[in-house]
UniProtKB/Swiss-Prot annotation:
Its main location: cytoplasm. Gene3D superfamilies: Glycogen Phosphorylase B. This is Enterobactin C-glucosyltransferase. Pathway: Siderophore biosynthesis; enterobactin biosynthesis. Its EC number is 2.4.1.369. It comes from Escherichia coli O6:H1 (strain CFT073 / ATCC 700928 / UPEC). Disulfide bonds: none annotated. The lineage of its organism: Bacteria, Pseudomonadati, Pseudomonadota, Gammaproteobacteria, Enterobacterales. GO terms for biological process: enterobactin biosynthetic process.
Length: 371
């Protein structure tokens, strides 16, 4: 069968669908990822065929502009009229899908061009979650930003999804929908690849702590959340790996000797065997840490991050710093908290027992064949 994946051109929306896409390919199906701009190449680097539905798009600049306008408008965490680049992808992708004719479309919650194409060509469509905070209301809100595209392409209404795929751990899932079948799937992190380097080997006599604000938040909000790294990281009894993209370092000052600054690393590799992870609360970071059984400190500010932080804290897998921020004493205590480690390892075991992407791919093919 031909499987079309919608991969919106942002890391947090594209990368989570690539593991399932690879599973379909390994199972012998023809897979195509639809993305845009530089993210078309990012998907191709995963060994997949890609259609660039928005050539030349600078989605990161577009997202920064949207966030700046949202803050000026004082609309809080509401989406506003923002399609997460489905509008920019719509015309090219509708035309392409018309002659490529996929048998199944899979989209993440904000890849709302997927249902439009499904409705136009009467193709089964499935939504794959990428985190905890997805609701039908949320998807409908983003879909409203495609009103003009629905009109341009003579599509009257969104179709009903054949199923939803839930990638969250069973004991933490809060997913609710309008009655579509929910298929559980093990979250298998995809963070890109890299060539092994000697410094990846951790010292056996020292703890390892990862710190990241993800790919979007530093560009939009700066580095205030991790000012403690510059001010007092030397008082933390650990080797600290600080992940900040090269384009988001303008506020960075000198760093203590126990901090290693990196641009891009395969996060799943570094979390295996780490002692803790401090991050902004993005769904990818949250689920990758849960998959590895690593305790977390989650800031949880903006977008879906408060939801991610809350479920981590309620399950006992991490803590939320609150308004007081972080101190070296708090971080040292966190690194030695055995109850956080125990709960995190329990969740990792839950996730390992869930159906893997290959099994889910086979189940979806069966559903399509049965009609």
């Amino acid at each position: 069968m031909r499987i079309l994946f919608v991969g919106p051109p942002l890391y947090g929306l594209l990368y989570p669908v690539l593991s399932l896409a690879q599973a379909f390919r390994v199972n012998g199906h023809e897979v195509l990822i639809a993305s845009g701009g530089q993210f078309a190449q990012k998907a191709a680097e995963a060994g997949l065929v890609v259609f660039d539905a928005a050539p030349g798009l600078d989605s990161e600049a577009g997202y920064r502009h949207h966030e700046a306008q949202r803050k000026k408008s004082n609309i809080g965490t509401q989406m506003g009229n923002f399609s997460f680049f489905s509008e920019e992808m719509a015309d090219h992708l509708v035309e392409f899908a018309g002659h490529w004719r996929p048998d199944l479309i899979i989209y993440p919650p904000l890849g709302v061009i997927g249902p439009l194409i499904a409705a136009k060509y009467d193709i089964p469509v499935v939504m794959q979650t990428v985190g905890f905070g997805h609701t039908p209301w949320h998807i409908r809100g983003v879909t409203r930003s495609l009103t003009d595209a629905y009109r341009r392409h003579n599509v009257g209404a969104t179709p009903r999804d054949m199923a939803w795929i839930d990638v969250t751990p069973p004991s933490m899932s809060i997913l609710e929908n309008d009655g579509e079948p929910i298929i559980p799937m093990q979250y298998v992190p995809y963070n890109g690849g890299a060539v092994w380097e000697p410094w990846w080997e951790r010292r056996p006599d020292r703890k390892r702590l990862l710190v990241s604000l993800g790919t979007v938040k530093p560009m939009v909000d700066g580095l205030d959340l991790i000012a403690w790294v510059m001010d007092s990281a030397s008082e933390v009894d650990a080797e600290i790996i600080l992940h900040i993209s090269a384009n988001a370092r303008s506020d960075l000052r000198s760093l203590p000797s126990n901090v290693r600054l990196v641009d891009w690393i395969p996060m799943g590799v570094f979390l295996n065997g780490a002692d803790g992870f401090i991050h902004h609360g993005g769904a990818g970071n949250t689920l990758t840490a849960l998959h590895a059984g690593i305790p977390q400190i989650v800031f949880g500010q903006g977008a879906d991050r408060p939801v991610n932080a809350r479920v981590v804290a309620e399950r006992g897998c991490g803590i939320i710093p609150g308004d007081v921020g972080l101190s070296s004493n708090m971080i040292n205590a966190f690194l030695n908290n055995r109850s956080l480690r125990k709960a995190s390892e329990e969740v990792a075991a839950e996730m390992a027992a869930q159906p893997c992407p290959g099994e889910v791919a086979k189940s979806l093919i069966t559903m399509v064949q049965k009609g």
